[in-house]
Regions:
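Bacterial N-terminal signal peptides that target proteins for export
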Residues: 1-9
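Extracellular and select intracellular beta-sandwich modules with Ser/Thr-enriched
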Residues: 142-148, 319, 423-425
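Short, compositionally stereotyped local motifs that mark structural "simplifiers"
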Residues: 25-225, 230-232, 239-243, 430-431, ...
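Middle-to-C-terminal accessory/interaction subdomains
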Residues: 165-167, 174-189, 194, 202-206, ...
Length: 565
């Protein structure tokens, strides 16, 4: 019996060993799956991809290819020799405290002698940690090929920013903060400018919007390489990762702590176009913008998009826009309007015009096209000195410009009381170079409308102000055209429609409520970072509603009286 039990025990032991041995490959595979989630382009193995993690700390395991070690940083900077770990395999524990390198250098971006703008560090704001890694060879040389991962800890984008795209932009902090070349700082440009007579006068008067600084510089030389990650609403991993060029954009709003940006997609960055459904359509883009709101930056933030959205339906172009949240090197940078921008690609997509055949004039300069295309614009401007009440002359005018587009466009901008609109400011029109599209006639594009409809509670944007007469004074071609009875009839029809349909008070109220339902919950975090302005926001909303409540009964009689004179 004892021998029988011994034999049985041996059989059981062998069976267990066999089962364990058979399971070991599967157990090892599962263990590897927990450690190895993906292999980066530079060959480093990571346990975790970029994305959202419901943890206050995250342990990331990294392993280099054989013969290499790993250099890494967690502040957004590019790894160098001093960042070499001396190891080919290691763990790094990431936490919220590692984010904040840019805001920690806020003194480089603020200008207290000119304004009182704010840029605050607040640990309650959502944040991501930027983990940059590079390989180090046996000689200690650090590779230029950097892998950038961004880990957002203990944040749920879907709950925090419902309905918004989240855009994460990473770049070497020197591109933003360097004294000579950083695009977010006052920098060397400001220090040189403030010693000039013009600079001294601006500082004395505190007319901060006239200041010159690194962040007011324009052009390709001020474009910086960056890495972009885009999260759709509800996504926990990036839906897109792409390299691009980054510039500060805008006019006076460049001085704000929260600046607007333009993103450029070029072959030099690896992608000639961005192909992604930014606006729920799978489209290709050469360039897009993240707009802080311009004159509306610390007010509603959505006023430009709101005004343009209400105005849709006229024969003018309104580009797509949607709310987005920006993280800059993992740091919360607030809500923006993500906007489609003018380009030959955009016009081709919208209207089917060959990209090489598109001409866009912005603020009396060629924006898209050839230098000599300015002559086409000058041909239009020449009608300012002609008698458009003459039928033959007006017929020629109609061959050059789409008069329906012109009537609708001018009606819209006059009705909203646009106080920041002249031929050389925020005025855009386009055509095909030849006659293949719409006979080569000029059509209009709506651009930057937030300085309107009671903005700043100024007389310039008041519902009582005669913006019709202002347009006649500021736009010589419009002055000539409005004297023609046929064009006047088109314009009167268009402005009445704008007031009775597009900007009907009840419709404005409804649309305002809809926009505020999305944007309102985004503002408390914005205030934490860039300063409290909720009172101004409330006043702006009230002023906008008041404008449209009063506007029709004031501006329409003005236009009617003109026709009777």
């Amino acid at each position: 019996m004892k021998n029988y039990l011994k034999i049985l025990s041996c059989i059981l032991l062998l069976s267990i060993l066999f089962i364990v041995a058979g399971c070991r490959p599967e157990m090892e595979t599962k263990k590897q799956e927990q450690v190895i989630q993906y292999v980066a382009e530079n060959g480093i193995i990571f346990s975790h991809k970029s994305g959202l993690y419901d943890k206050t700390e995250l342990n990331v395991h990294m392993k280099a290819p054989e013969g290499y070690m790993i250099a890494f940083t967690t502040n957004g900077t590019k790894p160098s020799g001093k960042d070499a770990s001396g190891k080919s395999e290691l763990d790094v524990t990431l936490n919220r405290g590692m984010s904040g390198y840019i805001v920690d250098h806020k003194e480089l971006m603020l200008c207290p002698e000119l304004n009182n703008f704010v840029l605050s560090k607040d640990e309650s704001l959502p944040a991501g940690v930027v983990l940059n890694t590079a390989l180090v060879d046996s000689k200690g040389a650090v590779s230029d090929e950097v892998q950038t991962n961004v880990y957002f800890l203990n944040v749920d984008f879907a709950k925090k920013f419902p309905g918004c795209l989240v855009v994460s932009i990473t770049t070497d902090p020197r591109n933003l903060l360097d004294y000579k070349t950083g695009i977010l700082v006052t920098g060397a440009s400001y220090d040189a400018w403030k010693r000039t007579d013009a600079g001294k006068q601006v500082i004395a008067k505190k007319t901060w919007w006239k200041a010159e600084a690194n962040f007011t510089r324009k052009g390709k030389s001020w474009e910086k390489p960056c890495r972009i990650q885009i999260f759709k609403s509800g996504s926990v991993k990036p839906d897109l990762e792409i390299n691009a060029g980054l510039r500060v954009r805008g006019g006076m709003s460049r001085a704000y702590s929260q600046k607007s940006f333009t993103l450029y997609f070029r072959e030099e960055y690896g992608n000639k176009l961005l192909q992604f459904p930014l606006f729920d359509k799978n489209r290709e883009y050469k360039t897009v913008s993240l707009r802080n709101g311009g004159n509306d930056t610390d007010y509603l933030k959505f006023k430009d998009t709101f005004i343009q959205d209400l105005g849709k339906g006229g024969k003018f172009t309104v580009f797509d826009s949607r709310p987005a949240i920006l993280f800059l090197n993992g740091e919360y940078w607030g809500p923006y309007s993500l906007n489609e921008l003018i380009s030959d690609k955009t016009m081709h997509t919208l209207f089917g015009v060959d990209e090489n055949n598109v001409v866009v004039i912005k603020e009396a300069k060629v924006e898209v096209g050839k230098k000599e295309d300015i002559k086409l614009y000058e041909e239009l401007q020449a009608f300012a000195d002609k008698d458009l009440t003459n039928p033959e002359t007006y017929k020629k005018f109609c061959d050059v410009v789409d008069v329906r587009s012109m009537a609708d466009y001018f009606a819209m901008r006059i009705y909203i009381g646009d106080g920041d609109w002249t031929p050389i400011h925020n005025h855009v029109l386009w055509r095909s170079r030849d006659t293949s599209y719409n006979g080569g006639r000029w059509q209009f594009i709506v651009h930057d409308t937030e300085y309107s409809a009671g903005h700043y509670s100024q007389k310039l944007t008041s519902p009582e102000t005669d913006h019709f007469q202002m347009a006649i004074q500021n736009f010589p071609v419009f002055k000539a055209a409005i004297r023609n009875k046929e064009f006047y009839a088109l314009f009167l029809e268009a402005i009445k429609k704008a007031g009775s349909e597009n900007y009907r008070y009840s419709r404005v109220q409804e649309k305002m409520h809809s926009y505020d339902k999305t944007w309102g919950p985004l503002m408390p975090d914005f205030y934490k970072r860039f300063g409290e302005s909720s009172r101004k926001r409330k006043e702006c909303m009230e002023a906008t509603l008041h404008f449209f409540k009063k506007r029709y009964d004031i501006i329409i009689p003005i236009v009617v009286r003109f026709g009777r004179s």
